[in-house]
Amino acid sequence: MGQLQKAKINQTQKAIVEIKNRFQKYFAKNLNLSRVTAPLFVEGQSGLNDHLDHKQKAVSFYAKKLNKTLEIVQSLAKWKRLALLDYGFSLYEGLYTDMNAIRADDDIDEIHSIYVDQWDWEILINKQDCTLDFLKSIVNKIYSTIKTVQLEIDQLYNPKQIILPDSITFIGSQELEDLYPHLTPSQREYEFAKMHQAIFIYQIGYPLKSGYIQSIRSPEYDNWNLNGDLIVYHKLNDQAIELSSMGIRVSKQDFIKQTNFANLKNDQENNFYHQMILNDQLPQTIGGGIGQSRLCMFLLNKKHIGEVQVSVWPNEYKDELLKKGIKLL
């Protein structure tokens, strides 16, 4: 490795630390969050793992001394809601944690890796807060945090390299389809993100008028009428990048409606988490995840997520990127 490349990588590593430290500090303050320790794995039969679109299989292993099969978490969407109850948080207090996951079935490209690192967060709220206005208020706080860190990182490393608007643009998934009826959901995201630079698409899960779904969502945690994705336009790659997904969590009624719609009722009787929802034992919350590596990639204006995180990539893939001057960590 040449000295110039080594210096570049060292600067990137320092910048990653700066981004993560600054973001966590402002994020916790703006949303009234306390940092907690989170599990790397959970019991396979507990129902606490996130099964995403119910097609991606969790990585599992057998723990001999426990005589149990454990699963590497795919996200902490369910665990966090239970943790707020167990840890005795008060109204409008919340938690955040470092979530490290392995998603063996994920795609591999410039923004996808089988290793996932994100800040998972959850806040205790009132049932009266289950509105789009409240969801948008939380989105604005998160976006404000991202914008603050962007300005500070630009001053330290790349002045005016990444420009984010002062405010984020909101749009419903159906409104987005009406705007671009001839495009696919991902194409709509790209066009709208390119136009506005930072967007939040809300109400994701149910079919649109066309019969298509904006993006497949698990029916078990977000209320599909009160959720959404925070997306930015990455000019270097000419690409829309989802930095965060979040939502107000399901009530008993939401859960029944959504699982019936998704035809995922079969395991409810034996699922600890499902039973807690059906028995109204979980608090009303809002929560989500923010991709750490994606945020770093975007703010540092990198072409590939592998420039800011260590994962495993095919050798021929790494060689091709190296020819383009992209060195993966």
UniProtKB/Swiss-Prot annotation:
Domain of life, source organism: Bacteria
Biological or metabolic pathway of the protein: Amino-acid biosynthesis; L-asparagine biosynthesis; L-asparagine from L-aspartate (ammonia route): step 1/1
Single Gene Ontology BP annotation: L-asparagine biosynthetic process
Compartments reported by the entry: Cytoplasm
Gene Ontology CC annotations of this record: cytosol
Record bears the keyword Repeat: no
Keywords associated with the record: Amino-acid biosynthesis, Asparagine biosynthesis, ATP-binding, Cytoplasm, Ligase, Nucleotide-binding
GO molecular function, one term: aspartate-ammonia ligase activity
EC number of the protein: 6.3.1.1
Reactions catalysed according to its record: L-aspartate + NH4(+) + ATP = L-asparagine + AMP + diphosphate + H(+)
PROSITE patterns in alphabetical order: AA_TRNA_LIGASE_II
InterPro entries, per the entry: aa-tRNA-synth_II, aa-tRNA-synth_II/BPL/LPL, AsnA
Keyword Lipid metabolism: no
Family: Belongs to the class-II aminoacyl-tRNA synthetase family. AsnA subfamily.
Record's protein name: Aspartate--ammonia ligase
Native source species: Ureaplasma urealyticum serovar 10 (strain ATCC 33699 / Western)
